[in-house]
Amino acid sequence: ETLELIQAYNTEAYVERLSAYLKARETLVEKYTSKKQMEMMPVKINQEELNFSPGKHNELQKAIIENFAPRFAPNAECLYVGDTIKKDLIKNVEKLSNLGFEITLHDKMPDVVLYCEDKNWIYFIEAVTSVGPMSPQRIIEIEEMTKGVKAGKIYITAFPDFSTYKKFSEELAWETEVWLSELPDHMIHLNGDKFMGPREKR
């Protein structure tokens, strides 16, 4: 079509072919734009409608916001969440700084950071589909950038399912938590002394 348009230049057929070419191109652009928008994953964060780009990692982050937070961090504010394409989808620099964060360009934020103001708790959450659980080394890295933070710190690794959790179980640090998106009502606590004790009969 492009070649035919060029060949028709300076001829009577040029205007007609140009019109047909532009119409076809506009339809093509609309088609691919629509497809791209359909692939995005809508998510509501801090009462704001946003979109994650497609992918397993972002699917898990979406589950953290929509399923973990209401169950285990009710009324929490999302201070940070990344995206596989747009690195910082949400980053409340002012609030993070007020809480005592020291963030440099070299620091790698956890995938999701939630803050519960009523309890003064911060949830650091790594969404793991292939790499990056809350290992002892990762805890040290986060502690370094949060030396000035006085709020209570909770370290969580989120996995999509049990099989992924089992792959990384030996890397996980003690005194951290695990959440599985396939079993959203439950947590795995890697620090028995704090939660050990009989439960009331149901």
Please state what every model-predicted region is.
Residues 64, 68, 75, 92, ...:
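Conserved catalytic cores of phosphodiester-cleaving nucleases, focusing on short active-site segments
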Residues 42-87:
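Hydrophobic, aromatic-enriched interface-forming segments
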Residues 81-83, 115, 125-128, 156-160:
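Short His-Asn-centered micro-motif
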Residues 148-149, 159-202:
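Domain-level recognition of nuclease-like catalytic cores that cleave nucleotide substrates
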